[in-house]
Amino acid sequence: MSGNHTPSASGPFSALTPSIWPQEILAKSSQKEDSSEPEICYDEFGFRVDKEGSEPGCSQMAGTPLVEDPPQRLRWQAHLEFTHNHDVGDLTWDKIAVSLPRSEKLRSLVLAGIPHGMRPQLWMRLSGALQKKKNSELSYREIVKNSSNDETIAAKQIEKDLLRTMPSNACFANVNSIGVPRLRRVLRALAWLYPEIGYCQGTGMVAACLLLFLEEEDAFWMMCAIIEDLLPASYFSTTLLGVQTDQRVLRHLIVQYLPRLDKLLQEHDIELSLITLHWFLTAFASVVHIRLLLRIWDLFFYEGSLVLFQTTLGMLRLKEEELIQSENSASIFNTLSDIPAQMDDAELLLGEAMQLAGSLTDVAVETQRRKHLAYLIADQGQTLGTSTTTSLSQVVRRRTQRRKSGITSLLFGEDDLEALKAKNIKQTELVADLREAILRVARHFQCTDPKNCSVELTPDYSMESHQRDHENYVACLRSHRRRAKALLDFERHDDDELGFRKNDIITIISQKDEHCWVGELNGLRGWFPAKFVEVLDERSKEYSIAGDDSVTEGVTDLVRGTLCPALKALFEHGLKKPSLLGGACHPWLFIEEAAGREVERDFDSVYSRLVLCKTYRLDEDGKVLTPEELLYRAVQSVNVTHDAAHAQMDVKLRSLICVGLNEQVLHLWLEVLCSSLPTVEKWYQPWSFLRSPGWVQIKCELRVLCCFAFSLSQDWELPAKREEEKQPLKEGVQDMLVKHHLFSWDIDG
């Protein structure tokens, strides 16, 4: 029976926000008849309580219930009344400003602790999260909607970590727990809003703790405040530059505030960051007992990352004597690792932290950060790449501007000057997003396959480059080698056979026989079953595992999850909306029409087809493959395969882009589409990218990608047809065995 079961005062789940109370568990606990099942006990925060203690840092803190101090609550109420209530009547939260004026009085109140019932409202105001929520162009609901379609590496990793984040808490213990879908939405929304960060396990721990005490939307905006304001940039990025820098700053502060401990760490050559990096990355979430965490976070949301240093120094100071008396390095390391779990007195810890490092200022920390960041980048410069340093000053948020409603535009029009500015800004952003997506793909190739490191990533904008595009396209066939990739292992039994392992690249010498080809691998020549390999169409580039989505999964996410959305945004820029409600409006429809129109134009002239036959290469069927016809055939191929699977136009567009990358003609296809002037004018506004000279710049940017060899599956997003795939391979092998009289092989084995 569903109902609104309420926890008892100071009982299990009583400290949580009401919307996350696990009603099933509360219902069971209220029915004492079911005494046959062993009862699982939970504390007021929803953590399992047993003899060993399932929660991090279980200590004497777990034995005392969380009870608000009435005088403390009165002091807070008096402060808020005095500073905010200028009207006669009761003070309510909607009358309190979105941010609290900073003062010494407010700091002393925060240091003494915030009443638990007031934390959700005060945390939002102290951190600046409420201000962000009010000022945001997009609502949390809209961000969640935008992020729900992102199938990227981040989304996959989030799914893997959902049940690992807080398994000992009833709200996140299993798939059906009430907090799991909330955590999923918050983390996916953050990954969408901060594409350079994506997902980091540290954000998952912090978000899960926030969801225990705040509503989902408020927890999201709190995370935004943490990422953008409370912590330095790149704290949660893939490089972890921000948090690594803070570990070096911490070592500097230990030299200053705890010289005896510094000497001990140097003597035993102990790398403190192996322990403390996790403390900083999670802002102590899952590191200390939840009650101590609440007190630390009260200060953290008011003063920012300075509190992380002060708290860590306070912990180390309290255990300094024990560390100095340790006998060996292992003992010191274990003692350091156990420090957070042994912290059971919030007043003692925070008092020690403020007494020791209360004079520490943001200016001092920031000065050290700049210095150590420079050292860190110098040390890791080769692996970080040149673009990393430019993004450390701030966290880059995805542009989130709400579009005017159609009715508003019709009734009141648009501010022409402002609209023009917005369009210019939007164009710049679109090019920047595409450029970043291309660079991410390029860096993937260079990191995965070193032979790509010499590729020039700076686009060539010269006029001559466009003429060379078609010359290079024609020249591809002249340097073309026929090679194939092994689909499975083939063991060599006779001298005339060619053995290979799955994913080996074989040079094809002869394809005269339908079933058995002759090839060369590592200096050896021999025959092999044709069905055991897949012919590579490498154009003028050598095959690279970095571009093969059957070998390297990451390239799929970079292309379909990053590059394709950036290209789609360009094609959507200035796309005319349908005049009738319900009319379709998608770049795919424009591409279909433009590709068909360009091919029809060539079909009108027999002479032009004869010229094209001499100019461009022919495929194995003798068909002319100009860039225009290659585009047309690719569109038709995608339609045939994807319509059968009822795929959406977004999927079709992504698959077409993958084909263009495989053929190394994506930039030429853009030129074909933009040169179809009647179609472009029909589908696009005059200020759109595709009707402006700006498309030439996009073509130059895309040309960089033709330097890399892609082997992407056109049907990657379609349901797999396993039965149909397996049968032809076996039949082909049977034919080959019959032909060569190799009946001694057990083909069913």
Swiss-Prot record:
Query: Coiled-coil region(s) at which residues?
Result: 414-438
**RUN domain: from which residue to which, for each copy?**
554-717
- Give the molecular function GO annotations: GTPase activator activity; small GTPase binding
**What InterPro entries does the record point to?**
Rab-GAP-TBC_dom, Rab-GAP_TBC_sf, Rab_GAP_TBC_domain, Run_dom, Run_dom_sf, SGSM3_SH3, SH3-like_dom_sf, SH3_domain
Where is this protein found? Cytoplasm
User: Which key words are in the record?
Assistant: Cell cycle, Coiled coil, Cytoplasm, Growth arrest, Phosphoprotein, SH3 domain
Q: Which SUPFAM superfamilies match?
A: RUN domain-like, SH3-domain, Ypt/Rab-GAP domain of gyp1p
UniProt-recorded name of the protein: Small G protein signaling modulator 3
All residue ranges annotated as the Rab-GAP TBC domain in the record: 113-304
The record's Gene Ontology cellular component field reads: cytosol; gap junction
| Record carries keyword Amino-acid biosynthesis | no
The family this protein is said to belong to: Belongs to the small G protein signaling modulator family.
Per UniProt, subunit arrangement is: Interacts with GJA1. Interaction with GJA1 induces its degradation. Interacts (via RUN domain) with NF2 (via C-terminus). Interacts with RAB3A, RAB4A, RAB5A, RAB8A, RAB11A, RAP1A, RAP1B, RAP2A, RAP2B and PDCD6I. No interaction with RAB27A. No interaction with GJB1 or GJD2.
Positions carrying Phosphoserine? S405
Q: In which tissues is it expressed?
A: Expressed in brain, liver, kidney and testis. Moderately expressed in heart, very weakly in lung and muscle. Not expressed in spleen.
**Residue span(s) of domain SH3:** 479-538
